[in-house]
Amino acid sequence: LKFDIDDLFYYSSHKILKRQGHLYVNDYGMQITLLSRYGIKSHAVRDRDYRFVNGDTNDFRYSNIEIINPYFGVTRFDKNGMFRYRVRIHINGNHTIGTYRDLTRAAIAYNKAVDLAHQAGIAKKYPENYIEDLSAKDYAEIYTKVKVSGKYLAYLDSLR
């Protein structure tokens, strides 16, 4: 395994264990996956949500890990050589919220879909996306303008 010097210091005082193909450490009684230290979510899939730039799955240097889908409910895909972002939410099956040209707008659309689900009486606690590089004003402006699928809105209406 290869690590940056800062991480090497951390791992020198923690034993790296492996279970069912997942690497983790015990830290204060909690099992923490190695990938979670790099901002990769526990449900992430390699080559869909993150990738190793040089192809070496044992190279955990920050420069070698690219996070493709950093937000909940958002998946990047290629359409005619351009990246697009598909937003889905799971309520008794997957519902497509929409397809967006930029990642930030897609993440906000997911948050809006979660808010609409809660307003429709769905009690499930969905994780929400936090966009660091936006002011509250900019976030609110995008939130009000972002469109959500008509099919999704009709589905929510059918639940009421």
Mark where each language-model region is:
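Boundary-flanking segments of nucleic-acid-binding domains in nuclear regulatory proteins
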Residues: 1-160
